[in-house]
């Protein structure tokens, strides 16, 4: 798979934090001690380092991580799975979206996480690996994540998503937080990390080469999903339920590349200072 670019740049991170905190440009400029000209410049993508450092504090962002993102100094080291894990990256408008497949090597039972805009790669992997799809888990129900659900549902796999964001589809089932599912030696636990959407769910999986958290749009490498209405809860859920997972946990995000807890604790402007 070609290298997947980071989902967000530094202007996206600044914008998400500003909208989440409901700060007007005038408020933010005053809190940061910046002129409106300097603020407009960095919002427009100009790298003014002193202005970036100044704006980080009122936005609750870690200044060094924000500056490194602006300088494009970091890209997450990609973890390798020896087996039983596949990532699919499909186009959606002017961006891409990820979906995932895990399976147990003995029983050949598999679980899918979202569909992206095309489930063809996932279906090809199921056939090529001689797998039976047992579960289709949804991180949330935004269109880009479930666009090909009808086709994947033809496998007759069980469809599951959060009780906080019911799909409204005949036969779909809902889970509560801390629900447990099993595929042979694989264990899957649900964590409610809502904020980006009402039922945004993280799936924590053990039994693979590394602990794995499929986080949907809860967070991305160097960023997180946007939330203009539940920003505080999204930060709280991410900090308490995702960022406290073991350091070697691989984060499989809804957009952008894979990353790890260890890397995000150092490089994500939203979370680095809470490590």
Report the location of each language-model feature.
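DNA major-groove recognition helix of helix-turn-helix/homeodomain DNA-binding modules
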Residues: 50-65
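A short, Lys/Arg-rich alpha-helix, primarily the initiator
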Residues: 1-21
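Core dinuclear metal-dependent hydrolase active-site scaffold
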Residues: 101, 180-208
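Active-site HxH/HxHxD metal-binding segment of metal-dependent hydrolases
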Residues: 47, 118-187, 211
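Metallo-beta-lactamase
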Residues: 198-275
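Conserved beta-strand hairpin/beta-sheet module of binuclear metal-dependent hydrolase folds
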Residues: 77-128, 203-216, 222
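Short C-terminal boundary/hinge segments that cap the last helix of small helical domains
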Residues: 61-75
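Short alpha-helical DNA-recognition segment
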Residues: 20-38
């Amino acid at each position: 798979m070609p290298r997947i670019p980071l989902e967000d740049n530094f202007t996206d991170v600044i914008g998400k934090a500003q909208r989440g905190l409901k700060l007007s440009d005038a408020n933010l400029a005053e809190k940061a001690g910046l002129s409106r000209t300097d603020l407009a410049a960095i919002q427009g993508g100009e790298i003014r380092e002193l202005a970036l450092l100044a704006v980080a504090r009122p936005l609750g962002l870690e200044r060094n991580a924000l500056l490194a993102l602006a300088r494009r100094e970091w890209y997450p080291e990609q973890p390798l799975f020896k087996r039983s894990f596949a990532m699919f990256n499909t186009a959606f408008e002017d961006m891409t979206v990820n979906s995932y497949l895990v399976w147990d090597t003995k029983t050949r039972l598999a679980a899918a996480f979202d569909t992206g805009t095309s489930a063809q790669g996932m279906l090809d992997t199921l056939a090529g690996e001689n797998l039976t799809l047992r579960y289709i888990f949804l991180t949330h129900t935004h269109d880009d994540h479930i666009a090909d659900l009808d086709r994947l549902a033809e496998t007759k796999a069980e469809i599951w998503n959060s009780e906080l964001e019911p799909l409204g589809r005949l036969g779909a089932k809902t889970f509560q937080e801390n629900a447990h599912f099993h595929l042979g030696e694989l264990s899957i636990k649900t964590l409610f990390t809502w904020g980006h959407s009402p039922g945004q769910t993280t799936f924590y999986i053990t039994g693979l080469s590394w602990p794995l958290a499929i986080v949907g749009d809860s967070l991305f490498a160097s960023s997180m999903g946007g939330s203009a209405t539940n920003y505080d809860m999204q930060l709280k859920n991410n900090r308490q339920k995702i960022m406290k997972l073991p350091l070697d946990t691989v984060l499989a995000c809804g957009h952008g590349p894979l990353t790890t807890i260890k890397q995000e604790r150092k490089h994500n402007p939203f979370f680095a200072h809470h490590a």
